[in-house]
């Protein structure tokens, strides 16, 4: 009996297992069909995406090819423009050499007054006597009014019209620095201040030695009694005027012949701030022009704009002070020409420097009637720009390169 029951159970289990297997196989087949359908869809989508990607790639390659052609065309146009500008600069230089500026001849004011007095005396005599002044005994007509012209030293009335040439002399020292001549003397010596803080000045006998020398071995070294700060120093009439590195920004007058301090002064300027937005190491910039020494500075009281002061080179006293409309922001350097402050601006990512603000102490010119003057493109940003009034050139330090800029001047009357 037990054996019969066992056989019945075995048959029943076998039947159930067969049914489950059939159901399972049917389920598996259904899932496989779904997967095959999805794989087919993915394959179609992949083919479509691959085609779109291929088309996009071809479009990008075509655009890059066109961009490269345009770039090459622009480069050729730029080269042609540079050639034309160079040719134009040479022609302008040639015209300037062929047509030198005429000498300035003026009649002395005292002689003019004497001329007027004699003329009035003559008219009065003729009115009283009724006869011409030439009939006066012992008096000749040629004694009257024939006053020869007297050549006088012309007053400074020039303004910058353009930068006509740029000369790169060499690369020396740090990215910031200063190089200059004696701006009031007749010496050919070149004075080099390497860095924005140091105590040693390098002196080369002439421009040739400075240009050809690859080191400071041929230079004489002057060790100053106090270190300097910034690049706002100047050599003027045998003396070095430099800013001492301390909290008061003391101006030191140092005689280069006997290597001694002649005088020193703390300028009457309170709460100083960097005068140039792109040259944070400069708090005071001493410059020179045809009229003497000037100080360019900035204070917290007028922290947005640059200030200007006239400096007495003998006593280091301030003669007069001005607040200018020239902003500090994006200014990299400045200089004075004929009593006018020219501020040079740039961008934080260095581009072409430009004179974009002019302040004249006499009020005869302003930024509105002076065109923007651009400097040729160069390496970085100017850490110093020193105007030489005798040469009409700017000695510039550009990211470690020593450069000369030649200026073209014109009379202020030509602006109006």
From Swiss-Prot:
Domain Olfactomedin-like: 155-411
Subcellular location: Secreted
GO cellular component: extracellular region
InterPro entries cross-referenced by the UniProt entry: Gal_Oxase/kelch_b-propeller, Olfac-like_dom, Olfactomedin-like_domain
UniProt keyword Hydrolase present: no
Record keywords, A-Z: Coiled coil, Developmental protein, Disulfide bond, Glycoprotein, Secreted, Signal
Record: glycosylation sites: 198, 258
Disulfide links within the chain: 156-338
Signal sequence coordinates: 1-18
Pfam families hit by this protein: OLF
Function, in words: Secreted scaffold protein that plays an essential role in dorsoventral patterning during early development. Stabilizes axial formation by restricting chordin (CHRD) activity on the dorsal side. Acts by facilitating the association between the tolloid protease BMP1 and its substrate chordin (CHRD), leading to enhance chordin (CHRD) degradation by BMP1.
Quaternary structure, from the entry: Interacts (via coiled coil domain) with BMP1 and (via olfactomedin-like domain) CHRD.
PANTHER family tied to this protein: OLFACTOMEDIN-LIKE PROTEIN 3 (PTHR23192:SF8), OLFACTOMEDIN-RELATED (PTHR23192)
Similarity section: Belongs to the OLFML3 family.
Name the UniProt record assigns to this protein: Olfactomedin-like protein 3
Source organism (scientific name): Xenopus tropicalis (Western clawed frog)
Upper classification of the organism: Eukaryota, Metazoa, Chordata, Craniata, Vertebrata
Name of the gene encoding the protein in the UniProt record: olfml3
